[in-house]
Structures are given as C-alpha cells and as structure tokens.
Amino acid sequence: MPTKICVTLDGGYVRALCKQSNKPPKDPRYIEKIAHACRTPEEVIHRIMFYDSGGFSGTAKQPVSGQTKQFTANDKWLHELSYKDLLSIRLGVLKFRGFVLNPARIPYTPGQPLTDTDFYPDFEQKGVDMRIGIDMANLSANRSVEVIALATNDTDCIPAMKHARRSGLQIALICFHGFRPAPELLAHTDFRRNIAWPT
C-alpha cells in the first residue's frame, strides 16, 4: 500500500525562495510542480495545502508628500491555483504596517531631501501559521495521512509539528536546494527531504 501524505506549503516562504532562485513565484503550474516534487515515488498525495494571504487593497498617505497612494491587489493567480487537482488554499490576511526607509538612504546624507520613492510599503502576513497548526491538528485527529511534507521556515509551526508526531504522524521537512532550514525545525522533524527546483 502506498503511503498517503499531505503536502503543506507555506506560500510566503515558498514564493520568497522562488524569487531568490529566479523561479516564477506566482505561477500556479509551477507551484503545483513544487508540490508534487515534495513526495517520493512510494507516496500518494492525499491533499496539497497552500497557505498564503491575498494582496493588500486600500489607501495610505505617503510619508513625505502626504499624498494618497492606492494599493490594488491582483489575486488572479490564487484563483487559478485553487482549481488545481487535490489543492486547497488557506488564506491569512495581509496587513499594511506603514512605510519603511530604503536601506540605501541610511545613513541619511544632509542636503539630500527624502522623497516618497525613498520609502517602501511594509506588509505583514497574519494568521497563516495558525491555519497551518489547525489543519495539522485535524490531520492528526482523523489520521487521514501518514506523513506531512512541510515546506516552511516558521518556527511558530513547531507546536503543531510536535503534536502531529505525538499522534503518530511523521513530519518530512522540505528543504529546497541552496537554502538551509531553521535548526529548530529540524529538531522536530522525522525526515529532512531535500528537493531540487522543478524544471
């Protein structure tokens, strides 16, 4: 009998690594390829869980001019991703935290006035680790899978990982080529699963 697994992808983490590796971060077909690369030939995917937040839509006053800046989210790629086989999307919320001075302007040079372009918007993803934890607890309770293949670098997931292992499930931490996971995560993992970027 093949081993049933749930592939659990922290979207913010996966997209960040895609950008650093010159891979398409919001291509539904490529994300699907990544998910399938997380299983071994002896395993069958029960479900693919993709956790992310939609884009931010709203307005904010720019830090220098005081003019209003409009933010418009484009979440078409998430809708397309949701139609993929076996894939379920869990969305957190993206919060706007203000504008941050570009490090290139630090330290500030007198005589060079700052402009709005010297600042970039700062966003924070909320609720994703909580949703990962809830779903891992549900998988532990109903025992619908034997292995959770987890792609994240968020140490807030450790309590859920510990609970799943105590319940008899195995955790395979997905390690992408060229990137090192947090040591704390490895301490609560059954397997370190190294994968190459799909072509």
Regions found by a protein language model. Name each.
Residues 1-107, 116-121, 170, 176:
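Domain-level signal for Mg2+-assisted phosphodiester chemistry and nucleotide/NA-binding surfaces
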Residues 90-199:
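Nuclease catalytic cores that cleave nucleic-acid phosphodiester bonds
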